[in-house]
Amino acid sequence: MNKIKYLGGLMAMVFLAACSSTPVIEDKPSSEFEGLNKVSSSGFSEAWARPGTNLSMYGSIKATPLKSADAEIVQPGQSIQTRVQRDMEMTPEIEQGLADNWDRAITAAADKAGLSTDGSGDKVLRIDSTMTRIAPSANFAAESSTPGRSTVYTEDSGEASIEFKLYDDASGELLAVVRDKRRVGSQIWSRSNSVTASADVRNLYNTWATRLVSRITGQ
């Protein structure tokens, strides 16, 4: 058995009932991130954190704009192992839309938890967010070029993967890394369209933001 260490605010509470066990830092150093150890039962797909860090001491966050330009894109109907570079183009408009959705989600979650979002104060936590993979189950870029409200049948709106890196803003020290992969949407074989897909993305970002903030504050 690995000796277990608890990590302040990041590990203090579980946000969703599905996450029944308390997240903990193990004595298992990351081979990818120097100084960070593996976190188990985090509520995310993967997580690493610096032992001894108390994220609940941070009363302010500074969320940098979400990046998505280099996200791996898997086309609808293609193998999950297939890497597609630009068949579904990640346009500046899509990038900005994703960034705007994330900014609204993390700001709302932080405000609700009583965290400042202007980056002021002595203890500021910087959050860098990057979309790493997008696998839509319908080509909404193509559908959006068709006049009117296009409808497609799809299992849901696809899936997406994201990475969060948490830094002490003053020192630049990396405190934690979180990676997560989620299905977008919840209805099996539902009618879906570009409007629904956008709503699913907003809901996904809200879920990510709320859970991340709960790990920071321990509330």
PLM regions: where:
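Second-shell loop/turn segments in exported
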Residues: 85-99, 114-116, 191-199
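C-terminal/domain-edge helix-coil "capping" segments
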Residues: 20-49, 157-160, 170-177, 181-219
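A structural "domain/chain start" motif
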Residues: 20-99, 216-219
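Extracytoplasmic/secreted envelope proteins and their assembly/folding machinery
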Residues: 95, 99, 103, 107-110, ...
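C-terminal motif of bacterial Sec signal peptides marking the signal peptidase cleavage site
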Residues: 15-18
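Surface-exposed short loop/turn segments
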Residues: 108-173, 190-191, 195
